[in-house]
């Protein structure tokens, strides 16, 4: 059985990607295919990085896209989300911010918009986690064990999500750029994830939320939750159906550009 230890993000190489607005032709087709399969309005950086190696990505996606359409995959994403959110509520003790935002002058519509953006990423991050986990597992010599014949596709009602408006570093004031830098340093991230750029659209909320979260990073409870999610993703990939018979040698043959 292949061992996949959890590595901190700082061990990642430099990630080079093409932003969605600049993607054209075959690259845009790949981006659109991922967003459609995952029912999300944004292309995650982890998937963008995969598409920088087109032959590899196409081989992986040919087998992974049918998996993403199964009920088992979608149920697994929901279960991972539920376990993570329950763990956060149980062990991190994060304080609600709604009343503090109201004191700053936020009305219910504005708070609702923030909650919608949070829902976009809370819904959409888990398919990307599973894509990254399956990709790493296959490249490490593993093979998916799920049966190709036994699976149930899941017709779903697409979420009506609009593409998030992002606060890029060159849009932000000095204070927000400082928070961006602090997030990357504190979380040891080689890139600034889309989630943070989307939530920074409301700077006063963003400052409050990061001030609340930052002291919890790297605490034993935070580390345990991170490890729990990592282990849950590995457990899921070993039970997923495999309708297109995705195998490790299929993706390793595509590792050249």
From Swiss-Prot:
UniProt signal peptide: none
Gene Ontology MF, one: (R)-2-haloacid dehalogenase activity
Primary enzyme class: hydrolase
Disulfide bonds: none
Coiled coil: none
UniProt similarity note: Belongs to the HAD-like hydrolase superfamily. S-2-haloalkanoic acid dehalogenase family.
Function statement: Catalyzes the hydrolytic dehalogenation of small (R)-2-haloalkanoic acids to yield the corresponding (S)-2-hydroxyalkanoic acids.
Name of this chain's protein: (R)-2-haloacid dehalogenase
């Amino acid at each position: 059985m292949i061992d996949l230890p959890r590595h901190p993000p700082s061990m990642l190489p430099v990630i080079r990607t093409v932003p969605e607005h600049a993607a054209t032709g075959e690259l845009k087709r790949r981006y659109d295919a991922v967003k459609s399969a995952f029912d999300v309005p944004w292309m995650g950086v982890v998937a963008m990085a995969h598409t920088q190696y087109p032959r590899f990505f196409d081989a992986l996606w040919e087998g992974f896209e049918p998996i993403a359409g199964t009920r088992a995959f979608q149920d697994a994403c929901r279960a991972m989300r539920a376990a993570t959110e329950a763990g956060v509520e149980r062990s991190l003790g994060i304080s609600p911010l709604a009343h503090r935002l109201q004191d700053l002058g936020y009305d219910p519509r504005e708070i609702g918009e923030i909650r919608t953006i949070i829902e976009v990423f809370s819904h959409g991050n888990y398919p990307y986690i599973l894509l990254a986990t399956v990709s790493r597992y296959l490249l490490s010599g593993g093979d998916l064990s799920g049966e190709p014949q036994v699976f149930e596709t899941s017709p779903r009602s697409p979420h009506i999500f609009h593409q998030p408006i992002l606060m890029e570093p060159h849009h932000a004031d000095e204070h927000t750029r400082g928070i961006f830098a602090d997030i990357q340093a504190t979380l040891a991230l080689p890139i600034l994830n889309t989630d943070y750029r989307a939530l920074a659209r409301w700077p006063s909320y963003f400052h409050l939320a990061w001030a609340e979260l930052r002291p919890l990073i790297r605490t034993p409870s935070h580390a345990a939750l991170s490890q729990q999610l990592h282990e849950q993703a590995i457990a899921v990939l070993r039970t997923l159906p495999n309708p297109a018979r995705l195998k490790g040698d299929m993706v390793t043959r595509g590792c050249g550009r």
